[in-house]
Amino acid sequence: GLDEPLLRAVLDEAKTFGLRVTAHLGPVDALTAGEMGVSAIEHMSGVPEAAKADPKLDAAFKAGFFPGWTAFERAWAGLDSASLARVAERLVAEKVTLIPTLVLHDTFSRLDDPALAADSALRAVPDSEIVRWNVPGMVRRAGWTQEDFAALRAARANQDLFVRLYRAAG
């Protein structure tokens, strides 16, 4: 992910051309990104970091994509509704569009479930694409364990709650 100075440079360049910036955040939290001028946030990235300062999240992002993503997903379960509401209200006030991709969070939380591969929604996906996804390889590269999958499933309620709070805020 982009650190704050690099994100600022991207935003400055985009402003030159009248472009809006959507971001998949890493080390920059959602509120800081919104205040800087990011117009949309993918995957609700940066929300846990904005809701609760945790130096372990910053360290995880510095360690690489999968350590950062895993820490981000796991962090959702420990967030309280008041903090989530505060972040949602401020993002709405900054006019930041949220692109939650809840299906992504839900799918990641169930990659250890063999029934997921049999989901009827996958019938429309060509076999060559499913092979290209290489789910076992991704799980291996991410280093996800049964404990991680349980934590990702536990996080889902707060992710859904955040979307409801964001919508209610405006």
Which residues are covered by each model-predicted region?
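Active-site neighborhoods of metal-dependent hydrolases
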Residues: 51-170
